[in-house]
């Protein structure tokens, strides 16, 4: 079988506060790279301090992609991310540079590296109608309906799982095809690059927790709450009926800050809630990352030499690329 001749890229994955940004910058400077953000908070304008967005100096030193794509009252889907990321990667490769995918949003990584199924978008009216029917006949009755229109999905979905029953019926009603049809379609196109997956994660949970606390305190000292107040004051945000439903506001830290500024609890209670929410996010991220069986794990502090050897072994000597691109 012929060797994979696709250009190389690296994916720097890991829980929040694990050091991905610093490593991405180091790798970009050493191997002539450009950074593609894989972070669902960094796509929103105005989310700076609380999202740990790369500052102007970092962006001047290394080109960054997929930052500040939407306003905080707008929505940005994983499918949109995958399309934008593919375009950015192709442009980086065309310049003879190394794409460095850095972030911790698992859904974005899956959409890009594995592809998404072609499921229709959610439909609020259809969901409301199904919920009203459930109130009348129960979810078991709706499961029976699902068994008639999509026996394959009904066999996988338990009669006591209302969320999945609702979604399966919603897809059928708005598309005319069962959800099992959509899920059987090929998920997406092959990436034009060969990717080394690197996971940065401290071996000891206490170390990661300490990093999370220190980072939040630094954000507060830099004016995080004032930043959230500025976002809240935007006319478009004030016009939103339920701001806490917006993806930008649901970002970890921002939701807790929003609730605090709404008058929920003391500053100390906000800090505790934000730290706890960030720890829970890190736990979810680690659970997802353990499923990435082809990824290589490194402790960001203990495994520096092993990490460097892994990167050098994969990337080799890219000095010729630097010379060709004039960098």
From Swiss-Prot:
SS bonds (residue pairs): none
Positions that bind substrate: 16-21
Source domain of life: Bacteria
Broadest EC class assigned to this enzyme: transferase
Keyword Magnesium: yes
Gene Ontology biological process terms, A to Z: tRNA modification
GO molecular function, one term: tRNA dimethylallyltransferase activity
Cofactor(s), names only, from the UniProt record: Mg(2+)
EC number: 2.5.1.75
UniProt site (Interaction with substrate tRNA): 105, 127
The keyword tRNA processing belongs to this UniProt entry's keyword annotation: yes
Sorted UniProt keywords: ATP-binding, Magnesium, Nucleotide-binding, Transferase, tRNA processing
Catalytic activity: adenosine(37) in tRNA + dimethylallyl diphosphate = N(6)-dimethylallyladenosine(37) in tRNA + diphosphate
Pfam families to which the protein is assigned, alphabetical: IPPT
Location of the region described as Interaction with substrate tRNA in the Swiss-Prot/TrEMBL record: 39-42, 163-167
Sites where the protein binds ATP: 14-21
HAMAP family: IPP_trans (MF_00185)
Subunit structure: Monomer.
Chain's role: Catalyzes the transfer of a dimethylallyl group onto the adenine at position 37 in tRNAs that read codons beginning with uridine, leading to the formation of N6-(dimethylallyl)adenosine (i(6)A).
NCBIfam families: miaA (TIGR00174)
Sequence similarity: Belongs to the IPP transferase family.
PANTHER family recorded: TRNA DIMETHYLALLYLTRANSFERASE (PTHR11088:SF60)
Name of the protein in question: tRNA dimethylallyltransferase
Organism encoding this protein: Xanthomonas oryzae pv. oryzae (strain KACC10331 / KXO85)
């Amino acid at each position: 079988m012929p060797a994979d001749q696709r250009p190389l890229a690296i994916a720097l994955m890991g829980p929040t506060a694990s050091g991905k940004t610093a490593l991405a910058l180091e790798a970009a400077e050493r191997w002539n790279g450009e950074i593609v953000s894989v972070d669902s908070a960094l796509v929103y304008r105005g989310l700076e301090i609380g999202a740990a967005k790369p500052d102007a100096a970092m962006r001047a030193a290394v080109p960054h992609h997929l930052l500040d794509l939407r306003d905080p009252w707008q929505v940005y889907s994983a499918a949109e991310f995958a399309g934008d990321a593919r375009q950015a990667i192709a442009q980086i490769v065309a310049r003879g540079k190394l794409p460095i995918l850095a972030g911790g949003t698992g859904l974005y990584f899956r959409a890009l590296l594995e592809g998404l199924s072609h499921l229709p978008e959610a439909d609020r009216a259809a969901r409301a109608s199904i919920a009203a029917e459930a109130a009348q006949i129960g979810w078991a009755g709706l499961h029976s309906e699902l068994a008639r229109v999509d026996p394959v999905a009904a066999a996988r979905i338990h009669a006591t799982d209302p969320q999945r029953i609702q979604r399966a019926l919603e897809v059928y009603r708005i598309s005319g095809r069962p959800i099992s049809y959509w899920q059987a379609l090929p998920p997406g196109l092959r990436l034009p690059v060969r990717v080394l997956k690197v996971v940065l994660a401290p071996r000891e949970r206490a170390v990661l927790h300490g990093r999370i606390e220190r980072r939040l305190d630094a954000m507060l000292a830099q004016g995080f709450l004032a930043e959230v107040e500025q976002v809240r004051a935007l006319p478009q945000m004030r016009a939103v009926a339920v701001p806490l439903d917006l993806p930008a506001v649901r970002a970890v830290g921002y939701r807790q800050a929003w609730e605090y500024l709404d008058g929920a609890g003391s500053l100390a209670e906000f800090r505790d809630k934000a730290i706890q929410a960030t720890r829970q996010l890190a736990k979810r991220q680690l659970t997802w990352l353990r499923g990435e069986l082809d990824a290589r794990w490194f402790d960001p502090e203990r495994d520096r030499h092993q990490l460097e050897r892994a990167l050098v072994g994969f990337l080799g000597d890219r000095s010729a690329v630097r010379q060709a691109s004039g960098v």
